[in-house]
Amino acid sequence: MYKFIVYRDKNGKWRWSMQTSNGRIIADSGEGYVYKNSCIKSIKILKENICKAEVVKVDPK
């Protein structure tokens, strides 16, 4: 089971991380939010759109 953890970083900004059942972080917000509601909104947007995401293969040159 996966879960989102919402927390404040050392600068007081709100962030989220997505963790597996064993605590491994597999995704994070990548940026801090001033408002907790903005952080939670970004999780909702991700959850609504993740299944539409395209998988892109990058070939090394």
Q: Each PLM stretch: what is its role?
A:
Residues 45-55:
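Short arginine-rich
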Residues 55, 59-61:
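Short, charged, surface-exposed hinge/linker loops at domain edges
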